[in-house]
Curated annotation (Swiss-Prot):
Signal peptide coordinates: none
GO MF entries: carbohydrate derivative binding; glucose-6-phosphate isomerase activity; monosaccharide binding
Listed name of the protein: Glucose-6-phosphate isomerase
GO aspect biological process, one term: gluconeogenesis
Active-site residues per Swiss-Prot or TrEMBL entry: E331, H362, K471
Gene3D superfamilies: 1.10.1390.10, Glucose-6-phosphate isomerase like protein, domain 1 (3.40.50.10490)
A Pfam family per the record: PGI
Function: Catalyzes the reversible isomerization of glucose-6-phosphate to fructose-6-phosphate.
Enzyme superclass (EC): isomerase
Amino acid sequence: MHNGFDALQLHANRLRGVTIPDLLAAELKRPEQYARQVGPLYFNFARQKYDCVALEALFALARNHNVTGAFQRMFCGEQVNVTEGRAVLHTALRGDLSGTSVAVAAYTAAAKVRERMYALIAGLDASEVTDIVSVGIGGSDLGPRLVVDALRPISQGRFRVHFVSNVDGAAMRRTLDMLDPSRTAGILISKTFGTQETLLNGRILYDWLGGSERLYAVSANPERAVHAFDIVPTQVLPIWDWVGGRYSLWSAVGFPIALAIGSQRFEELLAGAAEFDAYALRVPLEENVAVLHGLTAVWNRNFLGCATYAVMAYDQRLALLPAYLQQLVMESLGKRVKCDGTPVDRDTVPVWWGGVGTDVQHSFFQALHQGTNIVPADFIGTIRNDDLYTENHFALNANLLAQIEVLANGQLSDDPHRVYPGGNPSTLILLDALTPQALGGLIAMYEHSVYVQSVIWGINAFDQFGVELGKHLAVQLLPALKGESVEVVDPVTRAVLVRLRG
């Protein structure tokens, strides 16, 4: 059989007419047997549409693709980013698990940069600066933005951090209009310092601040940062080519995080991720949540034919998590060729999307409950929320449980307009509380789940060539928008340029 895929297709065929309530009735201990606890994180896969026999076939698929060996190669610093010839060592930013010289060197370098970062924070602490504007896009923005927003209520930092990513000048204007330049510092985050959005927004910020005295940078190309904005070299923090943007919040890209929540909280975030790293590397496949989550995604995509995947965050502080995961998953797994350059032989990443509960119940949940598509989902909530509004938290979690149940089980009615077909599989993830440790572990789990999926599909999760062509074309079209004579081949673009130029 084809590396276990054929056997799994037989199981999918066998389970086609089986409902999720049928599975719960057939396996009475399913709610406990399909649950895992990893530190402050609880996972329950009982409402996924597989049984124990199909699940064993999924684990066989993981063994056939040597997922365990793939984890070891990544943690040890082998060049698992084969298309760019690079190691992938974001795990070394938060811990040293493999003991190899490459990983140890990476961990040591990251620790030294954090010391420099904390020294810069101490300097800002002693100044009159109250606000920080962080300029970046993609991986240089989404991760820090998520963490700062999620952990703001328990922040130990004294700085208000404002994020600007879009090249649309309205975003920068809206931010700067509410700040005092004499009490503001800026951080420019760009791996290459060639990103159009960051350079343009950085120039606006430079001019608004009146120079580079309170301007900082994070880059794998520090010389370019110094040259482009005349930033003092000691105010530039390095990152490395073995850290991809969407995996970089653990590095100096997390500078805005540490400023916003405090150095101690940032270390707790790293520790939570490191704890999950140790778990992912050492726990056997059959008990490993990251492996099970990744295999479940493969099952829903390739064997149940689900083309989208939803993330529902039932905690307002995690409102940015769906957007963060959208980038992490779709930029990593949105590939059509394998590592060896041959076409993939099955579908890869579904479209990831989602929102925050209970708002989503009043927007797209109608389509989930009574539409024509089956949409698997992750529901993410918190057990304890130490705020003043406990009654609201009870109501929030009541809605969380109710929606999962109805989406899975459905409900019959004599009125066809009131039938809930059910059949939507979901995974429930609960954080004991939204702490830096728990958030770090949650993000690390998703990183490792993505890697599992990439190994099964034989694709490289760590490049993103698909984003390049559009950026290059935009640079070529920019002079045409300014009225310069530029050859434009595409007839529609040529016609629209006339309209845009007025």
